[in-house]
Amino acid sequence: MLLLWLSVFAASALAAPDRGAGGRRRGAAGGWPGAPNVVLVVSDSFDGRLTFYPGSQAVKLPFINLMKAHGTSFLNAYTNSPICCPSRAAMWSGLFTHLTESWNNFKGLDPNYTTWMDIMEKHGYRTQKFGKLDYTSGHHSISNRVEAWTRDVAFLLRQEGRPMINLIPKKTKVRVMEGDWKNTDRAVNWLRKEASNSTQPFVLYLGLNLPHPYPSPSSGENFGSSTFHTSLYWLKKVSYDAIKIPKWSPLSEMHPVDYYSSYTKNCTGKFTKKEIKNIRAFYYAMCAETDAMLGEIILALRQLDLLQNTIVIYTSDHGELAMEHRQFYKMSMYEASAHIPLLMMGPGIKANQQVSNVVSLVDIYPTMLDIAGAPLPQNLSGYSLLPLSSEMFWNEHKLKNLHPPWILSEFHGCNVNASTYMLRTNQWKYIAYSDGTSVLPQLFDLFSDPDELTNIATKFPEVTYSLDQKLRSIINYPKVSASVHQYNKEQFIKWKQSVGQNYSNVIANLRWHQDWLKEPRKYESAINQWLKTPH
């Protein structure tokens, strides 16, 4: 039934728009004549490589495939910080993480920060938000904060439970992530009751929590674990035979930051191939459920005759490692964590186009303003994606000059014991750490080594040096790292003073309690030594 509907859909709702009504750019700042509506759907933890071959073979994603066929897909889109709040802060501000000082899941934008949605509202758009936002300061657990603040301390503590899977008993259950479905329903109802009757163009944002792993409510050995949770209905969308078992480096050969991450994520123990494959299968099933919610929005737009004048954008805050590089979650510059989906469909957007240029989430802000015809602030880190996706600009030579040939991503939060900076160009991925000297950098040739298994930084010193110089021209990363060190220490001292002398007992009840309770005096001593050490 879905295939039949998609064929009808392709012939009608997404027919090429009249070039007189759309598809033209207005001035240098841009803007579509006729002020199209915009719908932005942002999921959590979606590996962008699933939206194109060969990753797309592992799971059925019909509505993402629909957007690919009738719109533009960006093959090399990246998060600007592979963790929820800092990534979303970059998307809503159009600025790199270090410019807004969105250092961790607790430290994001000021609640009164002017976002692209605020500007679109001032330019005549009716605006609405549903679901997960998570770009302002003050959220997330004490565990998450303390773990981020103390990452400079010289100890190793498991901060996560071992990743798990859970198949719900009801085989036919479709709405597994009920909270996301409720927000999707709210968005659809708003389209029907408000947007369809509005004389203004509208911009609708829907934030989904899927396919982020679920927190485990269990206690005991797996307390605090993350659970990949789904039903048989969604597992049937996964091609089990197409699931790739990732290669792992021996623990003794891992990069020191990778080892720290793997240890704190409780992934240094033994995992069978079946365990790994099941975790990945359940994750892909959660991606299929995410795709269905995106589909509900597209279906509603079609049914309300809004689709022909609505630009639909789908992306995610970051990816999910799903046991690649012996890790789950994100917090890494490896492809599974940093590579995100980014698809655009609608009036003036070229159909069935794949753009290989590197782009990132800071590009959402100028893109939104460009659609609205609003002037672009000069201080933005991002660039409008309209020239890359427009029917009028499809020229290989011009495309190279429409966006810088690099993107920047940085990470300063928990589960990683050094500030991390990634410069991605067409062929290379360069990853620098901390002050640039105390931790060895990494260099990967993504053309010959897409799985990022061989660090060639010392083998190609000229390339490494050149990329490091380029990175330093964009961001003074040793200085930023020092600022984060100081921030972490100041925040921990404030928190420690707020809980009094029993702070050790408080820590003993956080996620890392199992390790802390074995040798509390040892870890208290390590913290005291860290607090005394000047940076």
Swiss-Prot record:
The conversion to 3-oxoalanine (also known as C-formylglycine, FGly), of a serine or cysteine residue in prokaryotes and of a cysteine residue in eukaryotes, is critical for catalytic activity. The 75-kDa precursor undergoes proteolytic processing to yield a 23 kDa form. It is an enzyme of class 3 (hydrolase). Glycans are attached at residues 112, 197, 266, 379, 417, 502. It comes from the Eukaryota. The active site is at residue 84. The modification 3-oxoalanine (Cys) is found at residue 84. Its main location: secreted. Substrate binds at residues 132, 255. Ca(2+) binds at residues 44, 84, 317-318. Residues 1-22 form the signal peptide. Keywords: Calcium, Glycoprotein, Hydrolase, Lysosome, Metal-binding, Secreted, Signal. GO terms for molecular function: arylsulfatase activity; glucuronate-2-sulfatase activity; metal ion binding. It is found in: Secreted; Lysosome. Binds 1 Ca(2+) ion per subunit. GO terms for cellular component: extracellular region; lysosome. Its cofactor is Ca(2+). Gene3D superfamilies: Alkaline Phosphatase, subunit A. It catalyses: an aryl sulfate + H2O = a phenol + sulfate + H(+); Hydrolysis of the 2-sulfate groups of the 2-O-sulfo-D-glucuronate residues of chondroitin sulfate, heparin and heparitin sulfate. Its EC number is 3.1.6.1, 3.1.6.18. Catalyzes the hydrolysis of pseudosubstrates such as p-nitrocatechol sulfate and p-nitrophenyl sulfate. Catalyzes the hydrolysis of the 2-sulfate groups of the 2-O-sulfo-D-glucuronate residues of chondroitin sulfate, heparin and heparitin sulfate. Acts selectively on 2-sulfoglucuronate and lacks activity against 2-sulfoiduronate. Belongs to the sulfatase family. This is Arylsulfatase K. It comes from Canis lupus familiaris (Dog). The gene is ARSK.
